[in-house]
Amino acid sequence: MAVVLVCGGSAVSTAKTILYVPQDDRPVDLAYTTETARAAGYTVLTPPAAYLSGASFTGNAEALASWVEAHAGQADAMVLSMDSLLYGGLADSRKHGESMPVLQRRLQRVERWHRQYAQVPIYAFSTVMRSPWAGGRGVEPAYYLTYGRSIYSLAALQYKWHTGTLSAADKQAMFQLMGQIPLEYLQDWYSRRQKNMVLNERLIEDARNHVFTYFCLGHDDNSQHTQSSLEVAYLEKIAAAAGVTDFASFPGADQLGLLLIARAHNDFQQRHPTVQVLYPLGTGGETVPRYDGQAVEDTVAAHIQAIGGREVTTGRPDLLLAVYTPLLRGDGEAATVDNVPIMSASARTFLQQIRRATRQHIPVSIVDLTFSNGSDNTLLYGLYTQHMLYTPTAYNGWNTAGNAIGYGIGQGILAASMTAADRKNMLAVQYLDNWAYQANVRDYVQRMQLKMQRHVWEPCYAEEMTELQSLAKEQVQRYARLYLGLDPHTVEVTLPWRRLFEVAVQIRPQGDVPEEAQVRRQLREDRIKAREERVRAAAAALTQADGNEPADGKTPAQLAARQAYEDAVADLQRETVAAANARTIQEEEERAQTLRTWQPRR
């Protein structure tokens, strides 16, 4: 039974339990999703970390299924990643070696849950395999690092062949690529995609037969004119022909878990929230983001449908989705020189419309799509200078447009059931992740990494990734203090997949997080003190040697003591210079960051 507590006119707690199997253990799939749901009052059951796909290990599909069966009786709803339950996880779906009979047996096991736990609605999500232009270590088959671009180009030409747009030159290029890529790699890549297609077709059939209360098919990094877009078109045609209604298909993967939790939330409350969409001047909803392959307005509409909502253009909506698109058609990367705070008339008008809505007590969720993989510094500058950072209900400007749209709608809906403090923490996490780190700090850390590799920068830690995580934490805490007014001791920052692409930010109100700037300062001071102590010890040893030996100072003992003293002095000088140089470089880089952002208020 659900118990809803009301505070200030909005629900802040619902005693419902959601069993959630994420597609891996990245923050956007696990920590951020579950923190949002728990802040909205839900108890969230998640599998042991050892079962989930991670940075350096595959997920355990069999163990995950057994865990679901052991805990399904405690749940009011289940939100399940089929990529995890079939392959082990999202990345595992791209590189597994499972046979079709094994995969079909796993799917049949999931299908039985509809009968075994008939009282528990199942919300499932899966993905169409992506067609990346290049490989990432550990997230694609190993051969993709070498042949990824060629495979991508070949698939793009095959798209033209399927759509009847292949020219004679294209045909020649296609056959050349087929000759360059080892046949076994092509067979492996297409065989795995075929398995994914067959299983996704079966999942659509399960949605038609009401095995799932709702099923979402995500297009993982789905740019136009790729193998992925061909497969999406085929599966959507199958769903349309079968008349499947409890189904949605749209770009993105990492937002799917949270989106379906929001769908379950609306179903629990028997609500169909109304959503009004606001765009700035420019291409607006017609914008086609680089990783999505379709117009923003189509992606937004599909996400609203997926949460059981209804898009409206008049009246008072339950949520205003403020989608900030680029003035022109392209969306570049956030960590570029173009991402500087220059207020435009379009940005000012957009912010005025948001303020007007919030003054009418209409919840506003901002979706920042100006850049891919991070926030727009201009939009954040406007929110900051107009004291509006905590005015919206939610903010998202991360990774792909589909990711940000899904999170923006999911958090925007669930925020109505949160306390004001939890909403503020949710916003702070997104600002520090999407804006501070993705749009600004990540580029800083990459520059420092190059300096370290070129021996221009003396690190505090010997292990490279430990040093990079320390630098990221130091800078994100600095942004938190200067721009958000947060105590650095409440901001934890890690690089959980030991790469710079994603960060994990956690707000810890108890204030038990070390301030990384102080930690790094202390490490350098301790190194200098250790070398000063070594100089003192060497000086004492030299004095003793001179006192015990002839006065000419040329005995072996005297020479060794003098050399040890000179080495200690030189080592101290090197460390002192390195520390001073590190301070200078860091100050220069922080000034450069300020040019990309703005000078904070004092």
Q: Predicted regions span which residues?
A:
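Bacterial N-terminal signal peptides
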Residues: 1-8
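Sec/Tat signal peptide C-region and signal peptidase I cleavage site
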Residues: 11-15
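An N-terminal assembly and electron-transfer interface module characteristic of large anaerobic redox
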Residues: 16-519, 596
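Short, charge/polar-rich alpha-helical segments
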Residues: 517-532
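Hydrophobic/aromatic hotspots within intrinsically disordered, low-complexity regions
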Residues: 523, 542, 559, 572, ...
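Charged, low-complexity interaction regions
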Residues: 543-558, 580-584
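Long, low-complexity, intrinsically disordered segments
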Residues: 590-602
